Structures are given as C-alpha cells and as structure tokens.
C-alpha cells in the first residue's frame, strides 16, 4: 500500500486538534494529516448548528460517543452518562456553547507546579484573546479577530435571566458584567460561542473553515486511530481504520511529531493501546510496553451538577418553545434570520460564588435556564418553569480511565469516583441551601412558584445527600487524565511533550493538571493556541498586564 508521510499527524479533530491543524498549516511548507473518527460537521443539520437544539446531539450516536461510566460507588452505583463529541469539531460540536474561561487563579495555581511556570494568567490571556472575536469588540480581556465567534447577551432577552441575576445580588453576592473579565466572582450575563448569524461556533466552523482549502492539510473523517507507531521511544506514525472494517488498516508516517488531541477519555485510551502507560496493567492486557508511564489515565476529573427547578407563576418561560406546533416558526426565524429563540443556547446568565470563606476563589458555578428541563432534553416539566444548574468546581475526587480491550472501537472503563470526599458533600449541601436562598429573593417574587426539584420537603443533610446521590449528573467536563507537570504521575511536560518519548505530544483537556472553575472549551482552545506557537518554534505572545480580582 502507498504509505504517505506528513510533518505532523493530529489525532482528533476536536476543540484542540482543529486549532493545531489550522495554525500549523499557516506555514505553507508544513504538511499535516488530521484524523477524525467521526464524520463531517454537516452544516445543514440543525441539531448541531442551531444553538437552542443543543440537547439533540446528546440523544443520538452520530455526534456523540455516548460513553457510560462504571457503576459510581458514591452515586448509588449508577452508570452515568459521559457524552463526548464525535465528528469535526469534537465536543465543540455538541457542547452547551458556554464561553467561560475559568478563574485567573486556576492558572496561577497551575503555574505553581514545577515545569508549568509559564502557564500564569498573564501568559495565557493573550492566547484566549487570539482565539476570540467578541461581537461587541475587543478590550484588555477580549479578542476581536480570532476564529471563535463569541456572542454576548442582548437587551430584550428573557426577563427571568435578569431576575435571577438580581436575586443573586439581593442574596449578598457580587454583580459582575463579564464572567471572563476582571472579576469572575458574582452573577452576570454569560457569553456563548455563537456566530453573528446565530450558528454554533465550533472549532470546525472557526478554525477548519479557514484552513481546509490549504493544499498542505489533509482531513480524513471516519478514520479511527488504532495505535501510534513507535521505533523504540520515537513516534514514527499512526495506524488507523477507515470506516467500520477492522481489516481496513491504513498507516501514515510522520517526520516531526504525532499530536494526540483525542480528549480526556480517548487520549489515555490511545496511549495505553499504543503501549504507553502503567507497565503492569499493559502487560495484563497483552500489550507490548513501549514506555512505562504510570500517570496515563489517572487524575481524571469532572464537574458534577444538579438542577434546582421551580414553577413559574407568569407565562414568561421558554415552555411554549417545547411544544411541537411552535417549533416551525422558531426554526424558520433562526434559519432565515439567524435570530430568535433558536439562535441562543439559553444559558445567558449565571455566576460563580464561594460557598464558604475556606475558598480563595469561587467553588460553585451557576447556569440559569428559563425553562425546567434536563440538559439532554429529557424530563421537561409540563408547565412554565425555570431552573438553576449548580455544582462544585474543584472537587478533590479523582478517577481514572482504563482500557477494557485492544479493540479500537471498544469503550474504555471510566470511573470518575464522584463525591468520594467529605468536601464534595459539604459543597453540594451548601449549594442547594444557597440556591434556595437566592430563589427566595424579592427579584423572583413575581415569578417563583413551588419548588419542583428537589422539593421543599427535603431539608436535612441526609435528605439532600440522597437527592445528590440519585439526581446529580455530569456537566460533561472530563479532564486532567494525562496531566502536565514534572512529578511522577505527570504524563506530559509544560509543552505537552510526553515524558520519556520523542516526537509525541498530547494537546487537549486531558493535560490540565487541575480542573478549572468553569466550562472547559475556551481553555482547551487556549491551550492548543499556546502549544501551537511552541510547536512552530515561535516566540510566545507578550504577557498581558491586565489585572484580575482576588478576594481579600
């Protein structure tokens, strides 16, 4: 067979892989092969392109790997959803489109780790800005010419967004006008990755659209990576399968580096399948050990969240939009004008608070939604309602990813070990009680009806714990399973290079050493922008001097 050679092979066309593909091919002499196990991002499919349809891709298998965890021991042994994006755009093709970067202190904390000194907020902010075009223009914190379109909430959006923010302020928490600006702490409007024409701004739309016409970029969809090929400790290529036929094995060789961007679930899985991981485990799976690296698949983290739902006394919620007979008009307005309910992910307000003084920066996140429904579109309440999604941000619980089979189409064993520490339970109890306090402020008096969920009869610690155990769900933020650093459990260095190997990097949410305070997509893109400059041998962007808020 005719084996082609490229300067770089990127595994996974997701939030990070597409950034690398676009940036590396800006150098006209650099050839790149981008491998994606899923299909194209079909632009005529409203399920991925219409922001308000965000629940649809999670219900199917075309765009979602639809992993399930092992029974979670502290969650009544539930097997919990772990949706991950499949197709050009990866999880940016199916996520909730919240543009939230996390707290500056997250990055300051990363930078205290040996080898990560250049991951401070000042080092990273220029790369957040480089990636972004914000619809109201740039400033010290925001970009105005990047590939990711960011939309800000507009006047005239749902009255419940404003009432919920006002209630948070009345409950004694700060107000902030920009959750990605000087001060994350507090309640305020939430930005979203949506284009000016009301379309989802995935990294396929942002980055690949500007790169896919380049002769030095080859994009293969329906190409599932079997393993990375090595000559001793040097990555020399990738073996992959086209379509669903395991006999249809292809190989591509690499001159410079293999860049693994398959995400926090699949990146450790591919490393293990390729012989890089904990040696005793690899031998037990009958895999030849290329390199003993015990941290591969360890340190897995996620955000867990729950919904607090209320009836709405006035007919101002989005409940009518769930009725089939109202949807054609909503769809038409979105399709032809790029406006209306269809053009928003409906997460237009939220916030970050500290549930107690033991935390130096926020540990609880809120997303407000002007309808009562599950994130994946199930269990909609059959009347006007609204809800707060609330969860803790930096749980001490740690999980792991383990291969179950050498079959490249088999899902791995995933265990997040949710709620395994006393801090977890304390934070979730506090979150429920604080949310109830917020919901009972005067700003919500005209709207707030009875509490639907958890239900006001649940009051004791034991009752609240039981609710969390049975009803908390993932926020779809798996991360940290191939962490950056220099300690014995680190998988990559501060530039994403796999320890002990040559010509191999991991660049995606798996390399975060600690999960951030907020949604992951914006930071995953930033990481890829930053490492792209390092791969290209370019000088880092000048450090930012923009200040950030630290609670006294």
Curated annotation (Swiss-Prot):
Main enzyme class: oxidoreductase
- Keyword Membrane listed: no
Per UniProt, FAD binds at: 7-36
Q: Which GO terms describe its cellular component?
A: membrane
Q: Which GO terms describe its molecular function?
A: betaine-aldehyde dehydrogenase (NAD+) activity; choline dehydrogenase activity; flavin adenine dinucleotide binding
Supply the EC number(s): 1.1.99.1, 1.2.1.8
Q: Where is the active site?
A: 477
- Family listed: Belongs to the GMC oxidoreductase family.
Q: What is this protein called?
A: Oxygen-dependent choline dehydrogenase
Originating organism? Acinetobacter baumannii (strain ACICU)
